[in-house]
Amino acid sequence: MPARNPREAIPVGELNHAIATMLERGFPLTWVRGEISNFTRAASGHWYFSLKDARAQIRCVMFRGRNQHVDFTPREGEAVEVRAVVTLYEARGDLQLGVEAMRRAGLGNLYEAFLRLKEKLAQAGLFAPERKRPVPSHPRSIGIVTSLQAAALRDVLTTLRRRAPHVPVTVYPVPVQGAGAAQKIADMLDQASARRECDVIILCRGGGSIEDLWSFNEEAVAHAIARSAVPVVSGVGHETDFTIADFVADVRAPTPTGAAELVSPDRGHLLGLTRRAGDALVQSMRRELDRRAQHLDWLARRVRSPLAQLQERRARVDNLARHLRSALRETVVAQRHRQQLLAIRWTACRPDMAAASADVARLSQRMQAAATRTHERQTQRLARVAGALELLAPQRTLERGYAVLLDQRGRALRSPAELRAGSVVEAHLADGVADIAIAGVQAKLGGI
């Protein structure tokens, strides 16, 4: 306030403004404790009330932009703590508190205890990410640690029945608030872990005040979660509520329902995956069957009938016979040609007729003997080849007591697997054909 003449009068509004400025500058934001009195919610959404104790009271105002963050509605006589600035309502000259935040009395101590325990457990490594265990994607059984009277239990069971009705659920009943609740929760977690009935445990309860949720901020519960042999999912309170149990748990869900959704596989999704996998398997089997059928067709084209083999062998014998006859003719022609050459040479040289005649006679005999020997050797070779071919002929095989079986389409049958009881096959014997009805089929175990 600027300096003035002490005898000069100042307006009331200017005085009140100066006082308000001094108060706001002289008193920073301060926590004040007292009881609610004369609480009023204006149509604008602002709160007006008085804060009092046994010695005094002071008016308070909390504007809507601030009070919408308070998680409870103050009641007459309720003990609260407010964070406020001291100011003056200039229009009336009333001293008041401009409230920025509000909490129930005593919550400040609880919050400080919460922070101290959180720091202690963090230093002990209970919040370390490497300690967290993965939640099984398809649990065989699910455990729930909560109160039987909790609305959260009904929400969790409803969600599990909807998403995974095939998964059995075990409920471990325990009080979730009140004296001794924390130790009972810890004991039940130890029991559920020791029994190993479940693949995952849900620790849950519905929303409430910080006092209602305090059992989940106790050190005993934190250590029980940490030493559990079974993964623990916390679903405590609402999404904005955080407890020590949330930090220690392997996974924190925003709500009990969220915890149930997190641990349960969606049955519809699993059925869809199964159907798609089945369709893929059917397609794969069809492709494999088509491939094998194509391979069988290729093999069938390569298999020749006994008649075709017989015709091929006959053609080979005929070819060998032609070659043999040709070789004999060529030998005779060569010898005759040599004889003619000798005769020409004899005529040209006019040798001694008697000696020449003797030579000719001798050579003629040798030539005849050589031709005879050559003919005999070729004849013997032809006989051996013909005998070998005769042994290989299918007709000889049939004459030794064997038979060729053909199906109704004329295909040769090679395996008992191609026969069916009651079917009729055509048996080719050495000197005839017979139709045979198959009475039964038996695989060869060894030997004939």
Swiss-Prot record:
It is found in: Cytoplasm. The keyword Cell cycle does not apply. The keyword Transmembrane helix does not apply. Its main location: cytoplasm. Transmembrane segments: none annotated. GO terms for molecular function: exodeoxyribonuclease VII activity; nucleic acid binding. Its EC number is 3.1.11.6. It is an enzyme of class 3 (hydrolase). One of its GO terms (biological process) is DNA catabolic process. CDD domains: ExoVII_LU_OBF. It catalyses: Exonucleolytic cleavage in either 5'- to 3'- or 3'- to 5'-direction to yield nucleoside 5'-phosphates. GO terms for cellular component: cytoplasm; exodeoxyribonuclease VII complex. Keywords: Cytoplasm, Exonuclease, Hydrolase, Nuclease. Belongs to the XseA family. NCBIfam families: xseA. Heterooligomer composed of large and small subunits. Bidirectionally degrades single-stranded DNA into large acid-insoluble oligonucleotides, which are then degraded further into small acid-soluble oligonucleotides. This is Exodeoxyribonuclease 7 large subunit. It comes from Cupriavidus pinatubonensis (strain JMP 134 / LMG 1197) (Cupriavidus necator (strain JMP 134)).
